Amino acid sequence: QLPERVRPECVVNASSVSIYSSCALPMDEFSVIQPDATFFQAQVWNAVEQRIAELQLPGVRTVIARLGLVVGADRLMRRMLGLSRGYLGTVLGDGTQRISWISRHDMLRVLHYLLSNREQRGVFNIVTPQPITARQFGAGIARSVNRPALLRIPAPLLRILVGELASNFLTSADVVPARLQMADFHWDLPDFGEAM
């Protein structure tokens, strides 16, 4: 129990849209989550969020930020851009799985908005309103370096190459940022092509 004089006004906890497991239908913050016993990340994030709910401090506003794929200058994006420059741009699986994403720029803006607005609390999906397919993702990355996305890695081969991590790339995440939309939040980069 923290003394009142050192309690923060707000605590933001990072979570992931992976909590929704593989969702064929759009999911938002009000959707009932059915934990998938076969998807490890969904189990982990479900356990994290349950623990956060148990640790509520009186008078402290809690925000759970369920992050989608963050598109920015990180190691994963640099690697994918490098592969595309070398004509090794890929589409993972059959390319139809949905990816819920957000630009690094807009993610920081959302977090600032949530910290600055005292009435905002609870779960927020930190994604754009425009999810894309894995095919669009691979093509968008390749296009940003003026190359074609020539390769496709089938799901069985991806499972052989990276094992259990393959499920991170092969599951569909059609996640809607309903609470941000209800708050009339405006994304600067809602289009994947622009974000790249």
For the regions a language model picked out, list residue spans one by one:
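Conserved Rossmann-fold NAD(P)-dependent oxidoreductase catalytic core, especially the SDR/UDP-sugar
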Residues: 1-38
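Conserved beta-loop-beta element that borders a ligand/cofactor-binding pocket
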Residues: 10, 15-16, 50-73
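Catalytic helix-loop patch of NAD(P)-dependent Rossmann-fold dehydrogenases
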Residues: 24-64
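Glycine-rich "substrate-gating" loop/helix at the edge of Rossmann-like oxidoreductase active sites
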Residues: 36-41, 66-74, 94-102
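Glycine/proline-rich active-site loop of Rossmann-fold NAD(P)-dependent oxidoreductases
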Residues: 46, 58-60, 71-79, 114-124
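Alpha-helical substrate-binding/gating segment
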Residues: 81-89, 96-132
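Mid/C-terminal beta-alpha module of Rossmann-like enzyme folds, strongest
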Residues: 114-164, 196
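C-terminal amphipathic/interface module of NAD(P)-dependent oxidoreductases
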Residues: 132, 167-196
